[in-house]
Amino acid sequence: MKFCVAVSLLIIASMAGVISVSGYDVYPRDYAGNYYYCGVRKDPDCSKVCKLHGATVGYCHVKRCSCVDLPEKNQNFLSVIWKQC
């Protein structure tokens, strides 16, 4: 019973974006440290945002852009720009 509750909480937390399993859902941040939000009228194209940060592909997940295979060192926008200079 306790195992089922623990697994259920783990699944709910990973779906809500509270935790990431195996580094799959990594949310990039802009220059001010904010997440890129999507699902609104002027939403950014998450694939373009994630490729700018060095990830392979991106998608909208829980109203935030999520990147696949995004290195944690490239999560912040300024760290990516600093490497290009």
Curated annotation (Swiss-Prot):
Q: Which Pfam families match?
A: Toxin_3
Q: Where in the cell is it found?
A: Secreted
One GO molecular function term of this record is: toxin activity
Write out the coiled-coil annotation as residue ranges: none
The record's InterPro entries line, in alphabetical order, gives:
LCN-type_CS_alpha_beta_dom, Scorpion_toxin-like_sf, Scorpion_toxinL/defensin
Q: Which Gene3D superfamilies does this UniProt record tie to the protein?
A: Knottin, scorpion toxin-like
* GO CC, one annotated term: extracellular region
Give yes or no: UniProt keyword Secreted: yes
**What residue range is the signal peptide?**
1-23
The record lists the membrane-crossing segments as: none
Cysteines paired by S-S bonds: 38-60, 46-65, 50-67
Principal location listed in the UniProt entry: secreted
Which terms are listed as keywords in the entry? Disulfide bond, Neurotoxin, Secreted, Signal, Toxin
Residue ranges of domain LCN-type CS-alpha/beta in the record: 24-85
- Please list the tissues where expression of this protein has been recorded: Expressed by the venom gland.
Keyword Acyltransferase among record annotations: no
Q: Which family does it belong to?
A: Belongs to the long (3 C-C) scorpion toxin superfamily.
UniProt domain comment: Has the structural arrangement of an alpha-helix connected to antiparallel beta-sheets by disulfide bonds (CS-alpha/beta).
What this protein is called in its record is Neurotoxin 60.35
Which species?
Lychas mucronatus
